[in-house]
């Protein structure tokens, strides 16, 4: 525990006595995963241990579900009945039986509007098929997204071409560029479509656009209703702007030490960094 958390020792002991947490939901990139996009052995063992004790574990990411399953299997979430909350809440999957509990996304008209705006501000748009990332421009950053997700990559030059690939809907779209352009794109997108979509920067080069009725927090709340676990009985861990809805709905919001300041301001506890067993630190502080 870092010095900034030292003053919270007494509070943690009090929280342990008052509340028995039954679920942990964590972001992946920048939180659970280290900078090599791996789960540390310390995190793996700690997460398996609490699942053995009956605590439910949820992977909550902006990633497509396709890019989350291997991590879920590594954590034995199939065995223990964990959940994958993908696309920032656009999909919720029960790993025990592989069933899709919830899905909500963007239709063709949404895709068209976002694509036209991306052309207007000259920033590539990407969206997701079943196993392929489709991007309006082949760049290092758009290919990086496909590589990060373990998906195929295909460039499209027009909506007609995209339609030809059989894409009629998607769970989310992304505008992908350098951080300065992405920040400007966020401002432009929110000024034009802020009331129509959920818009958030997940990583400096990624602006995510999804159905306005979804975010990580709303979908986690649905999971709480399904399982009978109260929101006050949940811990959530995150590092970036798309994690804010997640942190706002749980009893114990946690930021990793590498999180931005806005995320830290939303948290009650600061864990170690994503490169220093952040989830293990959370588990040691709230379950032992």
Regions found by a protein language model. Give the residues of each.
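Non-catalytic pre-domain segments flanking phosphatase-related domains
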Residues: 1-26, 45-48, 52
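Mg2+-dependent phosphoryl-transfer enzymes with acidic/Ser/Thr/Gly-rich catalytic loops
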Residues: 19-23, 40, 208-288
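Short, acidic loop-to-helix structural element flanking the phosphoryl-transfer center
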Residues: 37-54, 103-110, 157-158, 211-225, ...
């Amino acid at each position: 525990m870092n010095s900034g958390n030292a003053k919270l020792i007494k509070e943690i002991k009090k929280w342990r006595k008052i509340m028995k947490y039954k679920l942990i939901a964590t972001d992946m990139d920048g939180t659970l995963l280290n900078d090599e996009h791996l789960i540390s052995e310390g995190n793996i063992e700690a997460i398996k241990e609490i699942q053995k004790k009956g605590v439910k574990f949820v992977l909550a990411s902006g990633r497509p579900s396709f890019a989350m399953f291997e991590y879920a299997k590594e954590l034995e979430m199939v065995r223990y009945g964990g959940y994958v909350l993908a696309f920032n809440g656009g999909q919720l999957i029960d790993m025990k039986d592989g069933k899709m509990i919830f899905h909500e996304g963007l239709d063709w008209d949404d895709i068209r509007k976002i694509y036209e705006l991306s052309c207007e501000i000259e920033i590539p748009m990407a969206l997701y098929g079943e196993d392929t990332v489709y991007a309006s421009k082949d760049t290092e950053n758009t290919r990086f997204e496909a590589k990060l997700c373990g998906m195929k990559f295909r460039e499209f030059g027009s909506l007609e071409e995209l339609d030809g690939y059989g894409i009629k809907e998607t769970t989310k779209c992304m505008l992908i560029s350098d951080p300065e352009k992405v920040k400007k794109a966020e401002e432009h997108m929110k000024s034009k479509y802020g009331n129509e979509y959920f818009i958030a920067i997940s990583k400096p080069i990624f602006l995510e656009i999804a159905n306005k009725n979804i975010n990580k927090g709303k979908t986690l709340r649905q999971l709480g209703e399904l399982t009978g676990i109260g929101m006050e009985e949940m811990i959530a861990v995150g590092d970036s702007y798309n994690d804010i809805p997640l942190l706002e709905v749980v009893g114990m919001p946690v930021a990793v030490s590498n999180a931005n300041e806005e995320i830290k301001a939303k948290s009650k506890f600061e864990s170690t960094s994503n490169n220093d067993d952040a989830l293990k630190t959370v588990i040691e502080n709230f379950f032992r």
